[in-house]
Each structure stands twice: as structure tokens, then as C-alpha cells.
Amino acid sequence: MTLTAPPRLLLVHAHPDDETLWTGGTIARYAARGVQVVVVTCTLGEEGEVIPDNLRGLAADQADQLGGYRVGELRSACAALRVADQRFLGGVGRWRDSGMLWEKPGQASALPDAHPRAFAVGDADEQADALEELLREFRPQVVVTYAADGGYGHPDHIRAHEVTMAAAAKVPDVLRVFHAVPSQGVVKEGLAALAEAEGMPFELPEPHELPGVPDERITTVVDVGEHLPAKISALRAHGTQVKMWLEQWNNGAGVAAYALSNGVAQPVVNTEHYVLATGDQQGCETDLFGGLGVSGTEPVGAR
């Protein structure tokens, strides 16, 4: 297959910061190779917990201004990753962060009383129609979202999966849909490296306490090592949600970790992982565009 249209990648994420946490290296890699990368964010992340003491008044149970603040964080992160365009599903503020509860380490569930505008309880058909409109506008060949379980059970991630699968099925331009997933094996290796690092300030979890899928289920492993500096810059842009730690970091080499508000370490690794949900698997082992006949694998300067 050879495509005459330029390569375009669209990623559907639930909240500001998810684009970086789940797919930041991938975004930076393809943007550096001339791919038009579009991020669709489904909510403003209004229900997020706030890490810095001096900003906790923004939280939903106080001034309820966190969503607007996180829009600025998202813009900074997208600039660091060189995102071509970022849109909010249905427009800014159409759907609200649904919030979540932790059932156990690494597994979330829905709140018992959702906000009336909560994304997870909104009209799924309206949401799918809004995404279909964006898919027809940008015409991506490749779309990325979460797996059916949302990665770790967050209701907004689950709804993002449902909406994406429904909308993408209606748009012929979409040739592949991938689910972003953590690799159990890579998470385990990353945690082992953090255990050997001196001065790592976060709580070190057991591997099974972090989300992950068996490596045999993974269809695509994207090397993002060259683009970790961009991902780390984007992680730092989400300062209300993410804390970063680096040891002997030098242009992508070293040990790095981040933690969310729970203070639990998660390793920054050189690869990001995907499961092909729809489309032809041939050629996609290391490249989301592999086998599609588009220039999505070579750096722009090498063409």
C-alpha cells in the first residue's frame, strides 16, 4: 500500500497530561519526522489532585479553577512535543473530568455521584459524533487511544476508548487504530533500575501495582529514546499533576522517574507500546505507520 496523502496521526486522550504520560515520546518522534500530529483532549482535567501546595486552591473542592489552569499546562506540553494542533472534544469545557476512586494500587473506578457534565456519563453518541467531525477534518491514517479497560479503569479513559472506536469505524481515512498500553516487562525493568538509583525520592511500587499488559499482547514497540528530553519537558509542563526526578541525565541517557499525586514512582523508559486494534498488522512492529507506504519513520533532515 502506498498513500499519496501526507502522514497524519491523531491521538484521543481523556485529560491534559495523558497525551504526555501515555504517548509523549511517540508524539515527539513522529512530529520530528514531519507527521502532522493532532491531540484531542476530552476534558479539562478539573477533578485532578493538585501537587504544589501554593496551587491547591485551584482544586475542584475549593475554587474549582483547575481546568482552566491545566489548559495552559497542556499548551506548554504540546509545544514541547511539537504537536501540530490540539482540540478539546466538543469544544473547551463541553465535558467535565468525571473523577475516580482508587480501588487498589493501579486500579481505578468511577465515583458514585458524577457531575452532570461528566464525560463518562455524557451522551456517547454526541461524543462520537464530535470526534467523527474531527476525524473527517484532519483525516488521520492512524488513531491512538486507550484499551477497553482504559489502561487502569478510569471511567474517562474507558469512555474515550468507546468513543474513539465508534467514531473511527465511520471514517474510511482511518486505516489503523492503536491502543496505548504499558508493557509489563518494561515496567519491571524500569522499576529495577530505579531500585538501584541513589536518592530516588518517590515510593517504589511492586511491578504488579502499576498498570501493564503482558508483552506477548503488544504488537508495536516504538523507540522514543531520542525524544525523551521532549517528553520530560512536557511532563514538567504538567506541574500540577506530575513530579519529575532525574539521575545523571544527559541527552536521553540516565535514569528518570515521575510520580503523580500519590507519590508512587513510575519509570521513564525508552519505548512506548501499542496493541493494534483495527487495521492491517503487516509492517507495524516498530512503526505505527509501517507498511502503509508513508514517510513516517525517517527524520525530516534525512529526506
From Swiss-Prot:
What keywords were assigned to this record? Hydrolase, Metal-binding, Zinc
Write down the InterPro entries for this protein, in alphabetical order: GlcNAc_PI_deacetylase-related, LmbE-like_dom_sf, Mycothiol_biosynthesis_MshB
Q: Which residues cross the membrane?
A: none
One Pfam assignment:
PIG-L
Q: One GO biological process from the UniProt record?
A: mycothiol biosynthetic process
Q: Which cofactor does it need?
A: Zn(2+)
Q: Name one GO molecular function term.
A: N-acetylglucosaminylinositol deacetylase activity
Q: Please list the coiled coil stretches.
A: none
How does the cofactor attach, per the note? Binds 1 zinc ion per subunit.
Q: Which reaction does it catalyse?
A: 1D-myo-inositol 2-acetamido-2-deoxy-alpha-D-glucopyranoside + H2O = 1D-myo-inositol 2-amino-2-deoxy-alpha-D-glucopyranoside + acetate
- Protein name as it appears in the record: 1D-myo-inositol 2-acetamido-2-deoxy-alpha-D-glucopyranoside deacetylase 1
Q: Which organism is it from?
A: Saccharopolyspora erythraea (strain ATCC 11635 / DSM 40517 / JCM 4748 / NBRC 13426 / NCIMB 8594 / NRRL 2338)
Q: Where is the signal peptide?
A: none
The entry assigns this protein to a family as follows: Belongs to the MshB deacetylase family.
